[in-house]
Amino acid sequence: MTELIKKGSAAKEASQFLAQASTKQKNAALLNLSNDLLAHTASLLQENNKDIIRAREKGTPETMIDRLRLTEERIKEISDAVKQVVALKDPIGEVTNMWKNEAELTIGKTRVPLGVIGIIYESRPNVTVDASVLCFKTGNAVILRGGSDAIDSNKALMSVIQDSLAASGFPRSSVQLIEDTSRETARDMMRLNRFLDVLIPRGGAKLIQTVLENATVPVIETGTGNCHIYVDKAAEKQMAIDILVNAKCSRPSVCNAAETLLIHRDVAEAFLPEMETALKEYNVELRADERAREILKDSKAATESDWEDEFLDFILAIKVVDSVDEAINHINKYGTKHSEAIISNDYATGQAFHQKVDAAAVYINASTRFTDGFAMGFGAEIGISTQKLHARGPMGLTELTSTKYIIFGDGQIRN
């Protein structure tokens, strides 16, 4: 708890400095950080390798090790992502509305930082930089708590970040890492209302549920991604296959990858064998319901848990449905309100799907893999919010701000 109190207090103080920093000052610091990350590539890879070795010794699946791994190319991508944040419009100070009331008061509504943001996440060291940079750009101090499996990578990245920001004249406590990765410290952080204004969990279902059950700090939930592809009877077959292969196989370990295929009964017999052939190239394990298994003889029988799981692996659950409404009901029962897709050339069916499916992002004839700040065209994001209050979907710079009313008068008093 001592580490949390010390760093929480320092973050609170730093947040006051950051709130007054100009866009020019922040961007200059971020450009320096981008260069410093590249300059420290060798040492970052050395520390990351310690995490990789430890993960392999523990028998961690390769798909999960991929989330942990840094390479020269990935560090270059992280560095480039910092520059992309520099190019984004700074929302701080933006006046979103202004008007005069009956008392002739001029009332303005402007964007301000949230204050101090806490982020609890798992085994993706790039999040250490992404989260730091987004919070910094929006004038927020941030306290990060990563997983134990990435601790050496995170400590090395934090050292580069803090040294770089300090060299640009910013407090080192603008961005901090909790190095104690125990569950007890994580739970203490969830109750750090004295210093944290908001807590954002990034990770699997277990982590997010733990945060929701234990946190007293306000939480923005970035949900798990049990995403579905529904292939309608009016779907173009090759388009559907291409989208499914992309959504499942391009990067199965991320939250916007597809986990379940729902297929209309009228096209199942024609579609499923060709789909199976396309997925064999990636050694995808198929877990199918009874009707789908009549067509896919080599598939495994799907269990109830298969409809609920975020596999994050080359595994696909498959269910044959009688109608779009059955597909919608299945998604709303088992989905995580993240990203859902329908493949159909029938306009009315597509409209019904997007109106009835409860998700942050609903796709018509496109892959779920586009649920990402950069892919959607508004820049880096801190995570994908699956809740409805404050933010929903990819959380960019604007979602890391609050608003403040500024009222100008010339002596008015209220009668």
Swiss-Prot record:
The molecular function terms in GO held by this entry are: glutamate-5-semialdehyde dehydrogenase activity; NADP binding
The main location is cytoplasm
SUPFAM superfamilies, per this entry? ALDH-like
What Enzyme Commission number(s) apply to this enzyme? Answer: 1.2.1.41
> Which is one Gene Ontology cellular component term of this protein?
cytoplasm
Q: Which Pfam families match?
A: Aldedh
Q: What does this protein do?
A: Catalyzes the NADPH-dependent reduction of L-glutamate 5-phosphate into L-glutamate 5-semialdehyde and phosphate. The product spontaneously undergoes cyclization to form 1-pyrroline-5-carboxylate.
Name-wise, this protein is Gamma-glutamyl phosphate reductase
Q: Which organism is it from?
A: Listeria innocua serovar 6a (strain ATCC BAA-680 / CLIP 11262)
